[in-house]
Amino acid sequence: FRDVKQSDYYYDAVKWALEKGITEGTGAETFSPHASCTRAQTVTFLWRAAGSPEPTGTVNPFSDLSPNAYYYKAVLWAVENGITQGTSADTFSPDATVTRGQTVTFLHRAAGAPSHGGNAAFLDISDNDYYFAAVAWAAQNGITSGTGNGKFAPNAVCTRAQIVTLLYRADN
């Protein structure tokens, strides 16, 4: 991709994600590393990283989830595995952007919500935050080192480069 250089921190992660079939580019020559990820994209990346397992159920719990959508099976799988519950009782909001806090929480749940020891070690993370355990686990396991200056930026939009990097580090 012309927008991914060998010197970019996410170069190996993008290469890995392509080789594993987790994602493709956004065009023939572009990956769009700085583009934001949607809830549908993030859940799909997680599902593909897990080997694209077939969901066991066929009941669609969301009014905004089309059976024809590329992410349909990924969302069903994510709900079945407790990775997400949607944004309300009957909506998934597939096109909503996902934050770094949400993404790490999804990843933590996909990994079976392993326990962590200690704190999240970031100035902008409190033990009262819903994503505290996920961020602490990710930091302690080398999955994230934050965004710099002791911060994680949990409310910042998660980019394509960031999601594939988190997945890559979790897999290695």
What are these regions (language model features)?
Residues 1-9, 24-73, 80-101, 109-134, ...:
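Feature responds to low-complexity, polar/acidic, surface-exposed segments characteristic
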Residues 13-14, 74:
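Ligand-recognition elements built from short beta-strands and adjacent flexible loops
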Residues 105:
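Alpha-helical segment that forms one wall of the substrate-binding/catalytic cleft
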